[in-house]
From Swiss-Prot:
Its EC number is 7.2.2.8. This is Copper-transporting ATPase 2. Its main location: Golgi. Cu(+) 2 binds at C153, C156. Cu(+) 1 binds at C68, C71. Residues 57-123, 142-208, 256-322, 355-421, 481-547, 557-623 form the HMA domain. GO terms for cellular component: apical part of cell; basolateral plasma membrane; bicellular tight junction; cytoplasmic vesicle; late endosome; membrane; perinuclear region of cytoplasm; plasma membrane. Cu(+) 3 binds at C267, C270. It comes from Rattus norvegicus.
Length: 1451
């Protein structure tokens, strides 16, 4: 067909189809070459390149053997993937398949063969084929993007384009040299992406598939004819093309936004289907579909497309069940090109009205910040946006009046200490639209509300720090992107909240999720508004180090499922194909034999429960395959069992051998020949040798079997260790002894020869014992990890919420099936199953596993919760943010594992020595053999002199060989490794026994040998330096004793606090009972506890307590109370709490009382007030007291040349206060478990040996990483198992004792080795016959290992005389040096910051700020500063694991 005729035909066809679809046409004269549907992939598309004639054929295949729809699905999936197949439809009822295919690529017979390969019978049905010419269209095309590496110039680009363009099925190809990629449009029934990739690889380049676009399918709408029109080319140019002739203003005149209601969508695939297909229609500029709202926003050119056309196109999309509703006023219009304007389209989406209130605020200091006020208001329900101007003293609040009122907003601000008034004339009604407009109050000042509008462009309303914004981007924008940022410098959850809250205020940030332990932030953002480098800069502006991570892929989920109901291979194929087509699943493999499926997925898109649901929807049953939780841990049960068996077997037969050896050493007045055991049973065989032979044989082949196995493995790797030396010595000794004994019996010798049967039992007994104990110690590793994992909850209560957060359904879900984004209910006393954020409810959480602090932390909506922590009080709903291996607890487990794996074993000195000793002895033995043979043949008289022939029938040569061999074997046996092998284990066994007697449990020889090298000891604070529980330090009576006695106050306060579960309340109750000398208290009613403030109740029946006078001392400075006060029963109204609690109840706190509280708070103590019957009558100072021996231990370690440091998760000021009392100069405060590990590694990298002393779960990674981990005996099981040394008596002076004992033990080991070496150095030359000329020859007793072994054992037993230095000795050594340090003498490092935080002089404002920071065990005080910004900043840096700002923990 001529080119001109072809264009005319296309034009006429396009006009016909457009007239049917009410699509307005435009003159061809305005046309110019533009691209359609492919502009977004980087190349132009034109009519000439998209349409060509193609011959298609439809055939019918008869199929026998199909039994279910799974078979139908398998056949359709298999055949549709073949080249040349356009479509296939299989009918189970008719037993046939209708296939549309390209006959030039394959025929019907080949299709039948493919079906038969699947196990079915297939044949072509006659007379049912039809063929017709077809034009290629986008409905039959797909796009793939390939990564091409190796291109260097434009010639490479031309070569690839030229070759790929010639391939059958390739429609277009565009190669980019700068991007190193190729974008190819192809026909999937003719060629596949893998073929395209292979063709490029064959040309010498490296190619990989990046992504592919699904074929475009629009059902009855003829996209090919739509493409044939040039209306889009003429009227609606793509936004990316800057060369278009129309001006931007002209183009905007035709753009409109249409809101549509779409029913029938059920998953993300529907969204992608609509967006992908409709977005490529002529005139459609942009489309955004919301699955949650069931709406779509379409931006289109009203001059070339109509709303009716869009409705028809969407409803025609497969599978054909979409139902589109046009806005009011448009349903009845047909063919009209007029569409609602942007503003009118937005009004269709408007929800209920919102209001903007302008507040006038007075009392804000100029040097303060409005951030705390904004945070407080943003957390109120119904508040949508806040903008407060510090300069003008005004604030604009956008709120929903149906949820919150303006009076409530005013009251909330007034509660912060400011004066507020609401301007009624400025309260205006607004509607929150889905467009780009921002609500604005009438009459607002430019400095307030307009700033709010600018801060919220892009419709990013501020939802508060606890809100996770997962909403899609605005309709007018592009798809959101995600970046991952590595953040350094975070020390607590307050830092996390600070980063999340600050980033969410910026335009373009859609959601922020920060992980504290991994130091990583996941940020979703709108790339048109903000870019990832700017996000990193925003984080750095907050004072952290931030860097964009190159690998932006999220951690991939991996599960194994058990699937039942599969019967054949087609079932497997059906499941795999269904899973791989599911969005979010990256890999699926199903095994029919094992009925298991291995699935990898993106946890952000899909979860395990969703995957199981997908499988069950296609008719199968799936469940999670439970894996052994401890499968990855080292299991030493087998090794322990085998070495225990080896030791016991060697011991049973070795004890008699040792007895016989001692018997041989007993001096006797008679010659040895006359001894009973020396008598021959038969000629050449004595009683002693017979017993030795029997016992040694059992030991050699039963007890020594595992030594042979280890020696074989060592020799196979071409190395010689202690096992090789032991096996070599015992085997040669046994074989030599057996041979000479048999020879003596054969020759009927009068005297039984000297044998070495005593060597193997001695060696095997002690070495097997050492190996057994070694593997028992190693097994503790897996126990520590198992106990760590046991902290995790096994199930989670996942709930489904309805309107107003009403719980519609609860479901108990195994932890493995909990997904990110799940809403989880946690009841009081339960464990938080995952990391998350509180959605609803208030509670207190015990987070000691991460902070080490025993004080519970207040949790409210928006607060971060940690997996494994315990919910102490209220029931809460949380949203899961980190699950599986991303939780904080999993990160701690990972830290412990890495520390244990990286901790190189300390090689025994004897093992190192044996590597040289073994070959040396073999060489000496061989030289001895050769030298004596040479000497014998040169001068036989020398041999005959020292080795008289037992028989005259033996030849001269035989005598020489026997003598030379005997001396050679004697050298091997006298060089006994027994003494070397016993040198270390005997000293270690005695040393550990002595340590246990002195209250120190040392796990094996490695920590005992290493402790003497320690140069730095790092102490944890809570529970290690301190007792770990709060104690009352001072009880100050604020009223006259005559008015209210101390005993009465103690009785009332003790009774009130007896109803409290808070640790501070328990401490107060305990103190009151001790002071009153009683265990019974009065009664309390109307008890109320307000988290973060205090308690209130009514107390009665305390008269009986006052009548009882216990023998107890009163606090210093308080006189004896008067007797006989009040005879009748009284009821007291009691308030106990912080300053704010007293203010709320109308009590005034004088400056003297406030100063007294501040003095205690400056010391790291918590001060609370007591009011009885409306009168402020007492102040209680509570603190976690320092252990009395802590300062002495610190001074003693320093005197030994050991550096001492304090490392704690508590805030810097509490840590500094403790350090000054103990005498520690260097402090690391506000550190995480990972920081503790990093600090230990940092010191180890400097060549120092580090000991870590701790007691909590959060210390366990550092305990495992340290060269010697020392745990407090009263600490957690996890810490005890992870440590190398346990202080049973909870005495810090035992740290000094363990180092002292280690030095003694190592010194004894060295003495033992010297004794063993001396024995060998003297014995080997004698055994070799070097001193024969001077008459020194090998005597029988020297063949026994007892000479060296006994000396080594006796040397080790001298350790039993060790005595631990007593307290008086330590105090005498530290006399005159136990002085508290000043604050300036203590250097504090915060988190991973190596910069010293010196102690500045306290200004009046610092004292005020300090009150709101310092606390007991990460508790903060109650003084609410009116200078909100500075208090907030301080809280972010100093508070630990608090939600958004400093929160006070009170009784």
């Amino acid at each position: 067909m001529p080119e001109q005729e072809r264009k005319v035909t296309a034009k006429e066809a396009s006009r016909k189809i457009l007239s049917k679809l009410a699509l307005p046409t435009r003159p061809w004269g305005q046309s110019m070459k533009q691209s359609f549907a492919f502009d977004n992939v980087g190349y132009e598309g034109g009519l000439d390149s998209t349409c060509f004639i193609l011959q298609l054929t439809t055939g019918v295949v008869s199929i026998l053997g199909m039994t279910c729809h799974s078979c139908v699905k398998s056949i359709e999936d298999r055949i549709s993937s073949l080249k040349g197949i356009v479509s296939i439809k299989v009918s189970l009822e008719q037993g046939s398949a209708t296939v549309k295919y390209v006959p030039s690529v394959l025929n019907l017979q080949q299709i039948c063969l493919q079906i038969e390969d699947m196990g079915f019978e297939a044949s072509a049905a006659e007379g049912k084929a039809a063929s017709w010419p077809s034009r290629s269209s986008p409905a039959q095309e797909a796009v793939v993007k390939l990564r091409v590496e190796g291109m260097t110039c434009q010639s490479c680009v031309s070569s690839i384009e030229g070759k790929i363009r010639k391939l059958q099925g390739v429609v277009r190809v565009k190669v980019s040299l700068s991007n190193q990629e190729a974008v190819i449009t192809y026909q999937p029934y003719l060629i596949q992406p893998e073929d395209l990739r292979d063709h490029i690889c064959d040309m010498g380049f490296e190619a990989a598939i990046k992504n592919r676009t699904a074929p475009l399918r629009l059902g009855p709408i003829d996209i090919n004819k739509l493409e044939s029109t040039n209306l889009k080319r003429a009227a609606v140019p793509p936004i990316q093309n800057s060369n278009h002739l129309e001006t931007p203003g002209h183009q905007q005149n035709h753009l409109a936004t249409l809101p549509l209601r779409i029913d029938g969508m059920h998953c993300k695939s529907c969204v992608l289907n609509i967006e992908g297909n409709i977005g490529q229609l002529p005139g459609v500029q942009n489309i955004h579909v919301s699955l949650e709202n069931k709406t779509a926003q379409v931006q289109y050119d009203s001059s070339c497309i109509t709303p009716l056309f869009l409705q028809t196109a969407i409803e025609a999309l497969p599978p054909g069940y979409f139902k589109v509703s046009l806005p009011d006023g448009l349903e009845k219009e047909s063919g009209s090109s007029s569409v609602p304007s942007l503003g009118s389209s937005q009004r269709q989406q408007e929800p209920g009205p919102c209001r903007t209130a302008v507040l006038t605020i007075t009392g804000i200091p100029r040097d303060s910040s409005v951030q705390p006020m904004e945070d407080m208001l943003s957390q109120m329900k119904g508040v949508q946006q806040i903008d407060i101007s510090l300069a003008e003293g005004t604030g604009a609040v956008l709120y929903d009046p149906s949820v919150v009122s303006s009076d409530e907003l005013r009251t909330a601000v007034e509660d912060m200490g400011f004066e507020v008034s609401v301007n009624p004339e400025n309260i205006t009604t607004n509607r929150v639209s889905s467009g780009n407009s921002v609500p604005q109050a009438v009459g607002d000042s430019p400095g307030s509300v307009q700033n709010m509008a600018s801060d919220t462009r892009g419709l990013l309303t501020h939802q508060g720090p606890g809100y996770l914004s997962d909403s899609p981007p605005s309709p007018g924008g592009t798809a959101s992107q995600k970046c991952f940022v590595q953040i350094k410098g975070m020390t607590c959850a307050s830092c996390v909240s600070n980063i999340e809250r600050s980033l969410q205020r910026h335009a373009g940030i859609l959601s922020v999720l920060v992980a504290l332990m991994s130091g990583k932030a996941e940020v979703k953002y709108d790339p048109e508004v903000i870019q990832s480098p700017r996000i990193a800069q925003l984080i750095e502006d907050l004072g952290f180090e931030a860097a964009i991570m190159e690998d932006n892929t999220v951690s991939e989920g991996d599960i194994e499922l058990i699937i039942t109901g599969m019967t054949c291979a087609s079932c497997v194929h059906n499941i795999e194909s269904k899973l791989t087509r599911t969005n979010g699943i990256t890999y699926a493999s199903v095994a029919l034999a094992t009925s298991k499926a291995h699935v990898k997925f993106d946890p952000e898109i899909i979860g395990p429960r969703d995957i199981i649901k997908v499988i069950e929807e296609i008719g199968f049953h799936a469940s999670l395959a439970h894996r052994n939780p401890n499968a990855h841990h080292l299991d030493h049960k087998t090794e322990i069992k085998q070495w225990k068996k080896s030791f016991l077997c060697s011991l049973v037969f070795g004890i008699p051998v040792m007895g016989l050896m001692i018997y041989m050493l007993i001096p006797s007045s008679k010659p040895h020949e006359t001894m009973v055991l020396d008598h021959n049973i038969i000629p050449g065989l004595s009683v002693l040798n017979l017993i030795f032979f029997i016992l040694c044989t059992f030991v050699q082949f039963l007890g020594g079997w595992y030594f042979y196995v280890q020696a074989y493995k060592s020799l196979r790797h071409k190395s010689a260790n202690m096992d090789v030396l032991i096996v070599l010595a015992t085997t040669i000794a046994y074989a030599y002894s057996l041979v000479i004994l048999v020879v003596a019996i054969a020759e009927k010798a009068e005297k039984s020869p000297v044998t070495f049967f005593d060597t193997p039992p001695m060696l095997f007994v002690f070495i097997a014992l050492g190996r057994w104990l070694e593997h028992v110690a190693k097994s503790k590793t897996s126990e520590a990890l198992a106990k760590l994992m046991s902290l995790q909850a096994t199930e989670a209560t996942v709930v489904t919420l309805g309107e107003d957060n009403l719980i519609l359904r609860e479901e108990q879900v195994p932890m493995e099936l909990v997904q990110r984004g799940d809403i989880i209910k946690v009841v009081p006393g339960g464990k938080f199953p995952v990391d998350g954020k509180v959605l609803e409810g208030n509670t207190m959480a015990d987070e000691s596993l991460i902070t080490g602090e025993a004080m519970p932390v207040t949790k409210k909506p928006g607060s971060i919760v940690i997996a494994g922590s315990i919910n102490a009080h209220g029931s809460v709903l949380i949203k899961a943010t980190h699950v599986g291996n991303d939780t904080t607890l999993a990160q701690i487990v990972k830290l412990v594992e890495e520390a244990q794996m990286s901790k190189a074993p300390i090689q025994q000195l004897a093992d190192r020595f044996s590597g040289y000793f073994v070959p040396f002895i073999i060489i000496i033995s061989t030289l001895t053999l050769v030298v004596w043979i040479i000497i014998g043949f040169v001068d036989f008289g020398i041999v005959q002199k020292y080795f008289p022939s037992p028989s005259k029938h033996i030849s001269q040569t035989e005598v020489i060989i026997r003598f030379a061999f005997q001396t050679s074997i004697t050298v091997l046996c006298i060089a006994c490794p027994c003494s070397l092998g016993l040198a270390t284990p005997t000293a270690v066994m005695v040393g550990t026994g002595v340590a246990a007697q002195n209250g120190v449990l040392i796990k094996g020889g490695k920590p005992l040998e290493m402790a003497h090298k320690i140069k730095t000891v790092m102490f944890d604070k809570t529970g290690t330096i301190t007792h770990g529980v709060p104690r009352v330090m001072r009880f100050l009576l604020l009223v006259d004793v005559a008015t209210l006695s101390l005993r009465k106050v103690l009785a009332v306060v003790g009774t009130a606090e007896a109803s409290s579960e808070h640790p501070l309340g328990v401490a107060v109750t305990k103190y009151c009972k001790e002071e009153l000398g009683t265990e019974t208290l009065g009664y309390s009613t109307d008890f109320q506890a307000v988290p973060g403030c205090g308690i209130s109740c009514k107390v009665s029946n305390v008269e009986s307590i006052l009548a009882h006078r216990g023998p107890t001392a009163h606090p210093i400075g308080v006189g004896n109370p008067p007797i006989g006060e009040g005879t009748g029963p009284q009821t007291f109204s009691v308030l106990i709490g912080n300053r704010e609690w007293m203010r709320r109840n109308g009590l005034t706190i004088s400056s003297d009382i406030s100063d007294a509280m501040t003095d205690h708070e400056m010391k790291g103590q918590t001060a609370i007030l007591v009011a009885i019957d409306g009168v402020l009558c007492g102040m209680i100072a509570i603190a976690d007291a320092v252990k009395p021996e802590a300062a002495l231990a610190s001074i003693t370690l320093k005197s030994m040349g050991v550096d001492v440091a304090l490392i704690t998760g508590d805030n810097r000021k509490t840590a500094r206060a403790i350090a000054t009392q103990v005498g520690i100069n260097k402090v690391f405060a506000e550190v995480l478990p990972s920081h503790k590990v990093a600090k230990v590694q940092e010191l180890q990298n400097k060549g120092k040996k580090v000991a870590m002393v701790g007691d909590g779960v959060n210390d366990s990674p550092a305990l495992a990483q340290a060269d010697v981990g020392i745990a407090i005996g009263t600490g957690t099981d996890v810490a005890i198992d992870a440590a190398d040394v346990v202080l049973i008596r909870n005495d810090l002076l035992d740290v000094v004792a363990s180092i002292h004992l280690s030095k003694r033990t190592v010194r004894r080991i060295r003495v033992n080795l010297v004794l063993a070496l001396i024995y060998n150095m003297v014995g080997i030359p004698i055994a070799a016959g070097v001193f024969m000329p001077i008459g020194i020859v090998l005597q029988p007793w020297m063949g026994s290992a007892a000479a060296s072994s006994v000396s080594v054992v006796l040397s080790s037993l001298q350790l039993k005389c060790y005595r631990k230095p007593d307290l008086e000795r330590y105090e005498a050594q530290a006399h005159g040096r136990m002085k508290p340090l000043s604050a300036s003498q203590v250097s504090v490092h915060v988190g991973m910051d190596d910069r010293r935080r010196d102690s500045p002089r306290a200004t009046p404002w610092d004292q005020v700020s300090y009150v709101s920071q310092v606390s007991l065990s990460s508790l903060t005080s109650d003084r609410l500063s009116r200078h909100g910004g500075m208090a907030e900043d301080g809280g972010d840096k100093w508070s630990l694991l608090l939600s958004d700002r400093d929160e006070e923990q009170c009784i």
